[in-house]
């Protein structure tokens, strides 16, 4: 392809609305254009990258026995009501009515549709296991679409669904997909880490892992152990209770005046104690239920853990000041567990019962209790892991200090179990004619998100640095002066030779200054650049530059195409 023929409108200025590097560079490099909030058009070079990621995904899904299907985007509401997710999904579900006022949604995911298909087609254990996948547009009515392709209203995903006879079969399917995902992201040239994760709205009773592309700009925090294979999203990471320090109080707890101290920091400073000596008490409302959640004062409540342990809830949130006043008779800053109403469930994090003595709110303005002993001076109805983990805490598997990194979720694998097959009656008959629900797994990859994540991980001040396997083209040939016959003809000849060898090459045949061509090449992120100039041609050589390392080599004209072909084959793993 010739640059003069490509629709590739590059920009020198950073778009005002682009907050993250990937969004900025996708627009500046002429790969996408915004159609509406969270909705984008893919231009030719952007679509080439997308198709390459899709092809890698297809090859690995097919290699594991997956069969490709195409499921409808528009899904009937009755299927979502059968599964119980029509209301659970909330406002992010894009809903619409047809002319007959029948309700539908634009699919954010396809568990209901695929399970409905299977219940109509699968009858016998002999038809299992089954792996079906699609690459399809998905829709989510994000309240605030942002970050370009990272969080849009329309996005492209691969989702595969496995159907097995039993949990052992599901475990085998899960491992197949886990291994396939590892190969996919390795082939894409990305640095990533699989981590234990939360199942979210998709649900299920089994395990789940997220595949995180590591990048400093990542919106998700992950913790991992450098000494064993433990890694988890902070939403899921297990916490080991910290060792207890201090002695139990000699006498009973007592009330103290704490005027104007509504925060943990203010109370700790006023009483000259550590934040870890305080009990943080927060009233949560899960749908129509109320819970008093207790954690140590230096810890943060993990609402994902709270929802999973006590719910799931359609809406879990901190109770408003008016509810706190009605139930506990005080402002939120003075809430405490001593004397909590019997109809209020008190749930404590694992560390709270281990505290020798504690400072807590007295449920009265400007008052706190000191020397309170958990489970002696106040009741605890449930004890659960409810807090966020921090870097430096002990690994739950081996005890080594955990480290933290930032990541971008690009894939997730779920063990759904029988959540959807029971709800939608997708059953099969075993060898004895007994009926059983299919045991399901769900495995998603954000294809368009992977494209953005690759840029977040691979960029510099000049633009994108595409890994060779997913680059729009492998090499760009840049004749620096199109008016010089030798330069122009050599560039053309090298371009044609590269094409004959199967190298994806593009020729910058524009009558532009060399600086403009070089800036565009770096911005778009072609992995290799061949510069054809009169000075090097005088010695029978051209310049070969590696975009990632910046390394420049002078290569004989007659050796160039073969050299590049070898580099590309090595990067693609072709023998």
From Swiss-Prot:
Annotated catalysed reactions: tRNA(Pro) + L-proline + ATP = L-prolyl-tRNA(Pro) + AMP + diphosphate
SUPFAM superfamilies tied to this protein: Class II aaRS ABD-related (SSF52954), Class II aaRS and biotin synthetases (SSF55681), YbaK/ProRS associated domain (SSF55826)
Entry keywords, A to Z: Aminoacyl-tRNA synthetase, ATP-binding, Cytoplasm, Ligase, Nucleotide-binding, Protein biosynthesis
PROSITE patterns attached to this UniProt entry: AA_TRNA_LIGASE_II (PS50862)
Location within or outside the cell: Cytoplasm
Record GO cellular component, one term: cytosol
Any GO MF annotation of the entry: ATP binding
Enzyme Commission number(s) from the entry: 6.1.1.15
Biological process according to GO: prolyl-tRNA aminoacylation
Keyword check for Cytoplasm: yes
Record-linked InterPro entries: aa-tRNA-synt_IIb, aa-tRNA-synth_II, aa-tRNA-synth_II/BPL/LPL, Anticodon-bd, Anticodon-bd_dom_sf, Pro-tRNA-ligase_IIa, Pro-tRNA-synth_IIa_bac-type, Pro-tRNA-Synthase_IIa_type1
Keyword Nucleotide-binding: yes
Superkingdom of this protein's organism: Bacteria
Quaternary structure annotation from Swiss-Prot or TrEMBL: Homodimer.
Stored PANTHER family: MITOCHONDRIAL RIBOSOME PROTEIN L39/PROLYL-TRNA LIGASE FAMILY MEMBER, PROLINE--TRNA LIGASE
Domain remark in the UniProt entry: Consists of three domains: the N-terminal catalytic domain, the editing domain and the C-terminal anticodon-binding domain.
HAMAP family: Pro_tRNA_synth_type1
Function according to Swiss-Prot or TrEMBL: Catalyzes the attachment of proline to tRNA(Pro) in a two-step reaction: proline is first activated by ATP to form Pro-AMP and then transferred to the acceptor end of tRNA(Pro). As ProRS can inadvertently accommodate and process non-cognate amino acids such as alanine and cysteine, to avoid such errors it has two additional distinct editing activities against alanine. One activity is designated as 'pretransfer' editing and involves the tRNA(Pro)-independent hydrolysis of activated Ala-AMP.
Protein name as it appears in the record: Proline--tRNA ligase
Organism encoding this protein: Desulfitobacterium hafniense (strain DSM 10664 / DCB-2)
């Amino acid at each position: 392809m010739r640059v003069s023929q490509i629709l590739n409108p590059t920009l020198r200025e950073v778009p005002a609305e682009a907050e993250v590097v990937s969004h900025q560079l996708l627009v500046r490099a002429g790969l996408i254009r915004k159609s509406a909030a969270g909705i984008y058009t893919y231009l030719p070079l952007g679509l080439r990258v997308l198709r390459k990621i899709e092809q890698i995904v297809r090859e690995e899904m097919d290699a594991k026995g997956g069969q490709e299907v195409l499921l409808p985007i528009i899904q009937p509401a009755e299927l979502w009501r059968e599964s119980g997710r029509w209301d659970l999904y909330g406002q992010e579900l894009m809903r619409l009515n047809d002319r007959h006022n029948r309700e539908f949604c634009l699919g954010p995911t396809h568990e209901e549709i695929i399970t409905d298909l299977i219940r109509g087609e699968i009858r016998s254990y002999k038809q299992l296991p089954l792996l079906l996948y699609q690459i399809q547009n998905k829709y989510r009515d994000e309240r605030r679409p942002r970050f370009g392709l990272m969080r849009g209203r329309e996005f492209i995903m691969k989702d595969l669904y496995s159907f097995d006879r039993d949990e052992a079969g599901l475990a085998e399917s899960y491992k197949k997909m886990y291994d396939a995902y590892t190969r996919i992201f390795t082939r894409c040239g990305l640095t990533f880490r699989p981590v234990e994760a939360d199942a979210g709205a998709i649900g299920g009773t089994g395990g789940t892992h997220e595949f995180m592309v590591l990048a400093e700009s990542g919106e998700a925090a992950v913790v991992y152990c450098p000494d064993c294979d433990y890694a988890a999203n902070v939403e899921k990471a297990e916490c080991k209770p910290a060792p207890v320090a201090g002695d139990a109080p000699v006498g009973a707890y007592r009330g103290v005046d704490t005027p104007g101290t509504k925060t943990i920091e203010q109370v700790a400073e006023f009483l000259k104690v550590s934040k870890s000596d305080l009990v943080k008490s927060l009233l949560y409302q899960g749908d129509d239920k109320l819970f008093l959640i207790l954690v140590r004062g230096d810890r943060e409540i993990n609402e994902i853990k709270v929802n999973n342990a006590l719910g799931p809830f359609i809406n879990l949130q901190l109770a408003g000041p008016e509810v706190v006043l009605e139930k506990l008779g005080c402002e939120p800053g003075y809430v405490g567990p001593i004397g909590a109403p019997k109809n209020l469930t008190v749930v404590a994090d694992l560390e709270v019962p281990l505290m020798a003595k504690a400072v807590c709110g007295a449920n009265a303005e400007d008052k706190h209790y000191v020397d309170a002993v958990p489970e002696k001076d106040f009741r605890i109805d449930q004890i659960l892991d409810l807090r966020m983990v921090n870097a430096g805490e002990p690994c739950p598997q081996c005890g080594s200090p955990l480290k933290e990194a930032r990541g971008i979720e690009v894939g997730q694998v779920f063990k759904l179990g029988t959540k959807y097959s029971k709800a939608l009656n997708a059953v099969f008959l075993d060898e004895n004619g007994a009926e059983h629900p299919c045991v399901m797994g769900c495995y998603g990859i954000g294809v368009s998100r992977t494209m953005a994540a690759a840029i977040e991980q691979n960029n510099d001040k000049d633009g994108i640095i595409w890994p060779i396997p997913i680059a729009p083209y492998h090499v760009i040939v840049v004749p620096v002066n199109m008016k010089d016959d030798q330069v122009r003809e050599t560039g053309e000849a090298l371009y044609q030779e590269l094409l004959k060898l199967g190298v994806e090459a593009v020729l910058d045949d524009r009558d532009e200054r060399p600086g403009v061509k070089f800036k565009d090449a770096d911005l778009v992120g072609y992995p290799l650049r061949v510069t054809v100039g009169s000075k090097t041609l005088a010695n029978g050589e051209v310049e070969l530059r590696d975009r990632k390392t910046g390394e420049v080599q002078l290569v004989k004209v007659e050796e160039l195409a073969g050299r590049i072909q070898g580099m590309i084959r090595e990067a693609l793993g072709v023998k």
